[in-house]
């Protein structure tokens, strides 16, 4: 599952500092404790509003109270201390999210309504292009999602990184996804010219989201995307149950990839008899395959695969996959990007591709995978500064 928009972990040193104690009091909704700390911190050091300068990775006291849905604490911070409900958190955790956005993830409608009544900006986006509706949807907060839509937030609002429906699919939030669809979200919307909510749901293995999207009219073949669902699933592997579902839903197994290969051929390349067996009766026989059977298809495809792919085809495919990976990376969908970089590597090793996949794995918390790619990158380009940097970053994560 993709990372939810905001997941805050309490400071590791707990209450050893007044700043941490302040944030912990806000997170836990302890108003009395919070007031005591505010008085202690600001005694002789300026006005109480100075407490908003204390933060942890961009998360200040109002962000913390908002995320916890602690309404009384929020009222105190806004009305008595002058907290700004639209102040973006500048840091690696907040990523530009405002207290108003974070309040959506509390699931507490009264807190969200309070922030809205005090100037909360429904259209403002954080550093990842997510509005408050994106935050509510990604966290699976159904009541908040309904409330925001009732206030006129466009159901397909997109600030450059995809609409809320895309976020629901990548976070496996079938309940909020259904709410969006009930409010007429477009199930066939194209994100950055490369993917759709249905393809995203497949990549993240969310069968519930896929069923809802298809029921709402999503194109089961994703013809407007760079590849069909069956092509992706049979090429990638590990999606056998999803292939069975897609075929029952009417997916066409006769649509090839950009090199003219059908899903049955891609499954045969991986020697997956179960998938070939499912696809065989629904696929139009290939004239060049003399024995149209499970073993016959696998044998033919394996023999054909021994022949060298034309260099221009290999390069074209690699460019396509890299483009898809780059798009996913810009959307901060690192799992999707990592998989696409891996497919591109299968078409020819490249230091750049290994470096890019290394940083994806780093951001996903996979230190060993990141280091492995960084080392491979250094083998291909020993003196490349980026390769050395990737290796050092992976080592830091593993410490």
Q: For each of these PLM feature ranges, what is it?
A:
Residues 2-21, 151, 183, 216, ...:
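Ankyrin-repeat-protein effector appendages
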Residues 15, 55, 89-93, 126, ...:
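Ankyrin repeat boundary/linker residues
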Residues 18, 58, 92, 96, ...:
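Start-of-repeat signature of ankyrin repeats
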Residues 24, 64, 102, 135, ...:
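Ankyrin-repeat alpha-helix packing hotspot
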Residues 29, 69, 107, 140, ...:
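Ankyrin-repeat intra-repeat helix-capping/turn positions
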Residues 33, 72-73, 110-111, 143-144, ...:
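Conserved ankyrin/ankyrin-like repeat signature
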Residues 38-49, 75-84, 113-121, 146-154, ...:
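Ankyrin repeat domain, specifically the short helix-to-loop turn at the C-terminus of the second helix
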Residues 318, 351-352, 385-386:
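Helix-start (N-cap) detector for alpha-helical repeat units in TPR-like alpha-solenoids
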